[in-house]
Swiss-Prot record:
InterPro entries listed in its UniProt record: Natr_peptide, Natr_peptide_CS
TM region(s), chain numbering: none
Official protein name in the record: Natriuretic peptide PtNP-a
Known tissue expression: Expressed by the venom gland.
Keywords, comma-separated and alphabetical: Disulfide bond, Hypotensive agent, Metalloenzyme inhibitor, Metalloprotease inhibitor, Protease inhibitor, Secreted, Toxin, Vasoactive, Vasodilator
A Pfam family that the UniProt record links to this protein: ANP
């Protein structure tokens, strides 16, 4: 549930935050598994 929201990041228009802050898609859990493969 939240496949579309999680895809972005926190469920907000990360289109700008992701580019401006860069922390929008870097803190979400979706990016976590990518950073540490085999963590799950």
């Amino acid at each position: 549930s939240g496949s579309k929201i999680g895809n972005g990041c926190f469920g907000l228009p990360l289109d700008r935050i992701s580019n401006t802050s860069g922390m929008g898609c870097r803190n979400p859990i979706q990016n976590r598994p990518k950073s540490t493969p085999g963590g799950s």
